[in-house]
């Protein structure tokens, strides 16, 4: 019997990326409390733990599936930055990132049930933001786009206009490193191709 593929995420970006790959999958909200925002913990451990928590939670109800979970954070000056809590927080984050490099870490976990085998990996990318103006920050916040994104920007949307350059996996910055995900799926005998 073919296993159902489940994305343990509410992220529209992750959903769009898997759809773009032509994957037949179901979206299930993991309903877990993510850890790490604003903390000085290891971003690698934070995104790994959050991705694993998501697949394990969904696995409780899906016992013949391939479950995919991911978590993404932005790190600057050792601070883990998740999604902004409000517009004031988005403004603070965008000011902190302005004209500087930061790192984006995504943890991706794949769990096969009923075997309950979990594979997890972390991808890191480096992003340099432009020295954008206060007016640009205000216009960007007014779009609403920063509010549900780690680091208060979406590189796949208008946030791309704030970015000067990237080093590493673009899809990692969007929130789902597809090449690494495919590598994990390959180890379980599946493929995005």
From Swiss-Prot:
Enzyme Commission number(s) from the entry: 3.6.1.9
Swiss-Prot/TrEMBL GO biological process terms: nucleotide metabolic process
Matches recorded under SUPFAM superfamilies: ITPase-like
Enzyme active site: 71
Marked site positions, Important for substrate specificity: 13, 72, 156
UniProt keyword Cytoplasm present: yes
UniProt keyword annotations, A-Z: Cytoplasm, Hydrolase, Nucleotide metabolism
One cellular component term from this protein's GO annotations in UniProt: cytoplasm
Protein's UniProt keywords contain Hydrolase: yes
Disulfide links within the chain: none
Stretches of the chain forming a coiled coil according to its record: none
Cofactors (names): a divalent metal cation
Source species, domain of life: Bacteria
GO terms assigned for molecular function: dTTP diphosphatase activity; UTP diphosphatase activity
Catalytic activity: dTTP + H2O = dTMP + diphosphate + H(+); UTP + H2O = UMP + diphosphate + H(+)
CDD domains: Maf (cd00555)
Subcellular location: Cytoplasm
Recorded family membership: Belongs to the Maf family. YhdE subfamily.
Entries under HAMAP family matching the protein: Maf
Task performed by this protein: Nucleoside triphosphate pyrophosphatase that hydrolyzes dTTP and UTP. May have a dual role in cell division arrest and in preventing the incorporation of modified nucleotides into cellular nucleic acids.
Protein name listed in UniProt: dTTP/UTP pyrophosphatase
Native organism taxonomy: Bacteria, Pseudomonadati, Dictyoglomota, Dictyoglomia, Dictyoglomales
């Amino acid at each position: 019997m073919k296993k159902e593929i489940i994305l343990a995420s509410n992220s529209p970006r992750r959903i769009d990326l898997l759809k773009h790959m032509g994957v037949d999958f179901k979206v299930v909200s993991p309903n877990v409390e993510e850890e790490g925002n604003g903390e000085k913990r290891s971003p690698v451990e934070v995104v790994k733990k959050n991705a694993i928590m998501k697949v394990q939670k969904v696995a409780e109800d899906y016992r013949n599936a391939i479950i995919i979970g991911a978590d993404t954070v932005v790190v600057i000056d050792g601070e883990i930055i998740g999604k902004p809590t409000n517009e004031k927080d988005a403004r603070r984050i965008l000011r902190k990132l302005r004209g500087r490099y930061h790192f984006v870490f995504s943890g991706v976990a794949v769990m096969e049930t009923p075997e309950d085998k979990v594979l997890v990996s972390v991808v890191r990318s480096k992003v340099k933001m432009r020295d954008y103006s206060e007016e640009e920050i205000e216009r960007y916040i007014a779009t609403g786009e920063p509010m549900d994104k780690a680091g208060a920007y979406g590189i796949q949307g208008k946030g791309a206009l704030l970015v000067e350059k990237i080093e590493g996996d673009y899809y990692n910055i969007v929130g789902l490193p597809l090449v690494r995900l495919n590598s994990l799926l390959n180890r379980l005998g599946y493929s995005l191709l």
